[in-house]
Amino acid sequence: KRYAIIVAGGKGTRMGNDIPKQFIEIAGKPILAHTIENFYRFDPNIDLIIVLPQNQQEYWKRLCSIHRITIPHLVVKGGETRFHSVLNGLSLIPDEGIVAIHDGVRPLTAHRVIENCFHVAEEKGGAIPVLPLPDSLRQIFPDKSSKAVDRTAFVAVQTPQTFRVEEIKKAYKLPYNDTFTDDASVYEAAGYIPELVEGNRENLKITLPVDLAIAEIRLKE
């Protein structure tokens, strides 16, 4: 059985926008609607869980009504951090199956990437999509000096980060630590090693106004 937890706790501050970024409309619909539609098109039998702050849930219901969003999904309240939000999402899932944990503001994930993540997680336990870094990298030190580092030793990490449910649930029993930047870091802290799969360039996390413009063009194609 396949599950997807869509984490949508954004505030929209970097957008210079009062509307939380997952609700900003592009190509005729809120970003979050595009994201869940993408997963539904990938697999209509997937169980979708959206994690939203309590004070945004009524607004989301209204948006679903306005935009006629009828894709079946459960909504669970977000927590104090992303870690706690994912934990709340996991609490709705039985202990068997494969779960993809995905950013609500990544509506352009290629279906081949989602399929690869599910397939590899089923085989190996955990899978995360990554991309090589196109730009040069520099490390900055406390005294403001910097030095070039080898970018081939690094990758950019995307979502959906996908795991066997029993393993990621076990990992999320660990006490919260602020070094947990994503689900893979929690998974690793529990002693597991996620496999890396190839991501897709268009799978951008909509964070800045320029991302909105790019996503709008892609979604209208």
Language model: regions and residue ranges:
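N-terminal glycine-rich phosphate-binding loop and ensuing alpha1 helix
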Residues: 1-58
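Residue-level signal for inorganic ion chemistry
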Residues: 6, 32, 89, 102-103, ...
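Hydrophobic packing residues within well-ordered alpha-helices of enzyme cores
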Residues: 15, 39, 60-64, 117, ...
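Conserved N-terminal catalytic core of the sugar/cofactor nucleotidyltransferase
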Residues: 33-96
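Residues at the starts of beta-strands that form the adenosine-phosphate
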Residues: 46-48, 126, 193
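Conserved beta-loop-beta/alpha segment of the NTase-like Rossmann-fold superfamily
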Residues: 80-144, 158
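A recurrent flexible, glycine/aromatic-enriched loop bordering the glycosyltransferase active site
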Residues: 147-157
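Conserved alpha/beta core of the MobA/IspD/sugar-nucleotide pyrophosphorylase nucleotidyltransferase superfamily
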Residues: 155-221
